[in-house]
Amino acid sequence: SDIASIAAICHAHNVPLLVDEAHGAHYLPFAARYGWQGGAVAAGADLVVQSAHKTLPSLTQTAFLQLNGGLADPDEVERQLDVFETSSPSYPLLVSLDGCTDWLAADGPAAFARWRDRLERFSAAVADLHNIKVMCFGQDALADHPDFFAHDSGKILLQIGAEGAAFLRAGGFEPEMVCGPNVLAMTSPCDNTHALDRLAEVLHHWDDSPSRIAPAPPAHLLPAPGNATCTIAEALLRPARQISMTMA
C-alpha cells in the first residue's frame, strides 16, 4: 500500500494513521542499506504495530507498537493500552521482546548483511531452474515487474502449486502460505546459514522431478461467487450444521 500518500491525507486532516505492519518488523532504519527500504514508519505512519515474531528473533504472539511523529499522544496511547491490554502480561513474552531489541542493537546490522548475502547466493543458485518461477530471484528480476508497487526480498514467492508445497514439506520446509500456484517462503535474518542453500537444492529436485505438475492457473482456483443469501453476521450467529463440500 502507498502508506506515504495515505499518511499525507490523514495528516492533512490532523488524523493520526495506525498501520498493522505484521510482516514488516524488519523494516528498521539500519536495514535500508541492505535492501529493505521503506516501511510504515519511514512512510510517516503515526502508530505502527509490527509482529516481531514473524521476521525477528522473538516468541510467537510478540509485537512492537511503534510511535512515530507528533500526532499520536504517548500518554493517551499508554492510557488506552491500560484499558485494552491484560493486567497480567506474559513475562516470558516481554523478556523475549527485550532480548530481540538487545540482539538488534548488538548484532542487527551484521545479521542483516549476512541475510542479504544468503538471499543473493540463493538467487544465483536458482538461476538455472527450467520449470519453476521464483519471483524476483534467479532469471526473474524485480525490473521485470514494473507494476509492482514495492517488493520485500525477504519473502520468496514460488510458483509451484500445492504439489510443490508438499514437496517442500517433505524436504523440511514449511511454507508460510499456499494459494493456487503461489507458495510463499518466509526468510529472516535468523535463518540457518545454509537454509537457503538447502531450499535451492529442494527446488532443483522438484524442477527435475517427473511427478512435477504444473500449477493450475488462478482463474481455475475458485468458482464464480453466487448471490449472497445472508450477511456475514447472520451466517456467524444463526444455528448451523456442517456438511460436505459436495452438498454445499
List the predicted regions and their residue ranges.
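Conserved C-terminal alpha-helix-loop-beta "cap" of PLP-dependent enzymes
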Residues: A124-A248
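Conserved PLP-enzyme active-site core in the AAT-like
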Residues: S1-C136
